[in-house]
Amino acid sequence: MNYYISDLHFGCQNKYENRTLEHDKIIKQNWNAKVTNGDTVYILGDIGREGGNKDNEYLCGIISTLKGKKVLVQGNHEKLNDIRIRQLFTEVCQYKEVSDNSNGKSRNLVLSHYPILMWKNQHKGWIHLYGHVHVSDEWDVYKQSLKYLNDYFKNKTLKGYIDCPPAEAYNVFCGLYDYSPVTLDEILLGN
């Protein structure tokens, strides 16, 4: 089974988002209660605080205890200068295209840390999953922009845009899903 999550920010305390070290324990507990070692988890960036050896050891310690195969789609906080961190992932990339199933139907996905306004085959049913914006004004602007784009193309008779499905994009910030990785079905049901 595939799971998706972003913006874990392990080891990063932030009073504005009520992020403490307790936050790290909650993510770990929720993750390991849901994910098996046979599952794949796509982490769409911002795994946590890197830097000094102490920070890196903490990050390695917590990530190594998370079940499943972990694929990292890099975010703006990833330096990955420490090989110990990089080795915890089966793959590290900037952008990823995958197929997944939802309600028995195969769906193509575009994965990125950043929200993209125009992505591959967006009006042919491809879904975009992203992070970075958490719950913010930037997220509101992105959602409004995507709505405008869908409304614009809904009434167009341009070649290739007749009867095309609306573009679908979903924020997989962990705070939106009780600090737990989620399946594509859970994402689609929750939106």
Where are each of the predicted segments found?
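Active-site neighborhood of phospho(di)ester-bond hydrolases with catalytic His/Asp-centered motifs
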Residues: 5-6, 42-46, 70-76, 111-112, ...
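Metal-dependent catalytic neighborhoods of phosphoester/phosphodiester hydrolases
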Residues: 15-16, 45-65, 74, 79-92, ...
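Short secondary-structure boundary segments
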Residues: 19-23, 70-81, 169
